[in-house]
Amino acid sequence: MKQIFALCLVLCSLTAQGQDDVLSAARQTNDYFMKKYSDPTQPTNVKKIRPSSLWTRAVYYEGLMALYGIDPQQRYLDYTARWSDFHKWTPRNGTKTTDADDQCCEQTYIEYNLLTGKGSLDATKENLQKQMATDRIDYWTWIDAIQMAMPVYVKMYAITKDKSYLDYAMKSYRWTRNECGGGCFNKKEGLWWRDKDYVPPYKEKDGKNCYWSRGNGWVYAALVRSMNELPVKSKEYKELKKDFLLMSEALILCQHDDGFWHASLVSDADYPGPEMTGTALFLYGMAWGIRQGLLDEMYRPACDKAWQALRSCLHKDGFLGWNQGTGKDPSAGQPVTFTSVPDFEDYGTGCYLLGLSEYYKLLKK
């Protein structure tokens, strides 16, 4: 009995140490980011001036809210509130926008409002209702859009119980999945083509399909963020769950021995190096799937290896290496290295925080 008790103490100690390491890494890179971008109202300046409500920054705030969930520091909420207040709780380019990239910031508006009771969702509701009123479901012509916009609609359904939001999200998702370019989801291989330009006959140089890591990561994260808002017995949850499981089965086979996924999931013909953002998003999804009982323990070693890979991306000052710049395929931002600086670094930090926050919860399980 004493031996069993001692073993339990050792295991608990190892778990606590593992959690401490994960939280330390998350804090380190977030502190770096908040120090570098101390004024969240300032526009970004990458080749041109853009407001800080653009999608790259919005993804960062998704990660920050996830970090707050495991590390509830008031300064995270203050930073988020200052950003949201400055942008008047409105999507980029106003309430008439139908661009998913513009709508990504609304995910954080909703989460912050639910958490604190502060802020306004009036502009978000107006924006979504205007888009639904067009009776078009073909706006999401690239798979990144599924992550940027789908969770907004599903979250709005969850708080209003207005089924029209969920119906619109599902119809739009099915259009991208089954019809855009003949269908962006390859059901046989469980992976997504980024948009109609990458559907066959387009191939990588070695003749393999072009499956972009971060693009698939966006969809994987969107499935998590949407299912997380839905009743598990609902038909919509079950529909998304099927795709989540298909993707999980495919993705675990694409992970490399060092824990990374590469920019191209199935082809190393041109870009064989590690890539951080896709790796972080896949960790986010797999850790969540295990915690929800959707994925079995076979996926746990993949999560552990992914954490070690992500840990190796972290510089001493909090900068993240192996972060592929913006683009739409494996060639974007190359060469991607430990020291290369991407055009935008905010979305990469957001992906990192999402992955580590969910892995932290898995360790606590």
Range-by-range predicted roles:
Residues 1-20:
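Bacterial Sec-dependent N-terminal signal peptides
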Residues 38, 72, 88-92, 117, ...:
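Helix-capping and short linker residues that terminate individual alpha-solenoid repeat units
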Residues 72, 110-113, 154-161:
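Hydrophobic/aromatic side-chain positions at a characteristic register within alpha-helices
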Residues 120-153:
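Asp-box/WD-like beta-propeller blade repeats and closely related beta-sheet repeat scaffolds
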